[in-house]
From Swiss-Prot:
Biological process annotations from GO: translation
Cross-referenced HAMAP family: Ribosomal_bL31_1
Protein name: Large ribosomal subunit protein bL31
Origin species: Vibrio vulnificus (strain YJ016)
GO CC terms of this entry: ribonucleoprotein complex; ribosome
UniProt gene name: rpmE
Xref: Gene3D superfamilies: Ribosomal protein L31
Length: 73
C-alpha cells in the first residue's frame, strides 16, 4: 500500500436516541455520531410495534392529494 494516501482508521463512539452507545472503527472525521435507532430499540429486532418513520415528502404528498386518488375515476 502507498503511504499517505489512505484515510485514518479510528474508533468512533455512536450514541442512539434510546441511550445505548457503542464504539466502532471508521474513517469518519468525527469522534462521535448520533443515531435515531439501533439494534436495541429498532422494532424489527425488539419485536415491539412502533412507528419509526419521521415523515417525509411522500407523507406530505398524500396529505395534499390523497383525496384525489381515493379510487374515483
Amino acid at each position: 500500500m502507498k503511504a499517505g494516501i489512505h484515510p485514518e482508521y479510528k474508533a468512533v463512539n455512536a450514541t442512539c436516541s434510546c441511550g445505548n452507545s457503542f464504539v466502532f472503527n471508521s474513517t469518519l472525521d468525527k469522534d462521535s455520531i448520533h443515531l435515531d435507532v439501533c439494534d436495541k430499540c429498532h422494532p424489527f429486532y425488539t419485536g415491539k410495534q412502533r412507528i419509526v418513520d419521521t415523515g417525509g415528502r411522500v407523507d406530505r404528498f398524500n396529505k395534499r392529494f390523497g383525496a384525489l386518488s381515493s379510487g374515483k375515476k
